[in-house]
């Protein structure tokens, strides 16, 4: 895939406000402050497309970005931030459960993990949630540039040991762009309908 153009379209706070399902969606999920906005900006080559914040838990909406006029990237609220109120967590939980559980347009979920702290309890819970809803997902290990070669290898081993249903695991640096080509190739694979199914031996790749 080559991204020619990208534009922010809308923020959604309720399921009834979702766009129609004629356009496929790739969903970006992960813990608060894992680097979703930085990843989206890196993938699209648009530095300010997704607003980055140093405040965990700031993204509270489903943010839609139109890619090449025929695909949505959807940035969903981060999880695992303790300072958020129970009321807000409950509201986010209902929104995400309804969206991930019922949205037919979702082609793939990209689950971002901090490569320095991969597979935390909340990450494993999200993997179980996606598997329960039979959603194909791949793993992106963010902030790869902060690790040594030995630490990178360990992060991949730890992730692979618990992400048994993941279709792929890609190490990514939003600073250098490492992993961008591989990740976009995986997107092409899913959008073309060539995926062989979550968790199959032929589908899981580590790069």
Swiss-Prot record:
Domain (EngB-type G): residue spans on this chain: 22-193
Domain of life: Bacteria
A Gene Ontology molecular function term of the record: metal ion binding
Ligand binding (GTP): 30-37, 57-61, 75-78, 142-145, 172-174
Gene Ontology cellular component terms for the protein in this record: cytosol
Keyword Methyltransferase: no
Protein's gene: engB
Family: Belongs to the TRAFAC class TrmE-Era-EngA-EngB-Septin-like GTPase superfamily. EngB GTPase family.
CDD domains: YihA_EngB
Binding annotation for Mg(2+): 37, 59
Task performed by this protein: Necessary for normal cell division and for the maintenance of normal septation.
GO BP of this protein: division septum assembly
Organism: Chlorobium luteolum (strain DSM 273 / BCRC 81028 / 2530)
Keywords: Cell cycle, Cell division, GTP-binding, Magnesium, Metal-binding, Nucleotide-binding, Septation
Cofactors: Mg(2+)
HAMAP family per UniProt: GTPase_EngB
Protein name: Probable GTP-binding protein EngB
């Amino acid at each position: 895939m080559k991204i020619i153009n990208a534009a922010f379209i809308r923020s959604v706070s309720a399921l009834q406000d979702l766009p129609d399902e004629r356009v496929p969606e790739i969903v970006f999920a992960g813990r608060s402050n894992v680097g979703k906005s930085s990843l989206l900006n890196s993938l699209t080559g648009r530095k300010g497309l997704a607003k980055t914040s140093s405040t965990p838990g700031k993204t509270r909406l489903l943010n839609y970005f139109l890619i090449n006029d025929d695909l949505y990237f959807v940035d969903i609220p981060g999880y695992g931030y303790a300072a958020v109120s129970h009321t807000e967590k409950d509201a986010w939980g209902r929104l995400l459960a309804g969206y991930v559980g019922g949205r037919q347009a979702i082609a793939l979920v990209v689950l971002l993990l901090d490569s320095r702290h991969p597979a935390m309890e909340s990450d494993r819970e999200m993997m179980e949630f996606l598997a329960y809803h039979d959603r194909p997902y791949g793993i992106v290990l963010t902030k790869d540039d902060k690790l040594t070669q030995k630490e990178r290898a360990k992060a991949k081993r730890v992730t692979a040991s618990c992400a048994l249903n993941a279709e792929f695991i890609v190490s990514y640096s939003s600073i250098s762009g490492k992993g961008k080509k591989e990740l976009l190739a995986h997107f092409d694979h899913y959008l073309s309908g060539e995926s062989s199914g979550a968790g199959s031996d032929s589908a899981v790749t580590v790069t």
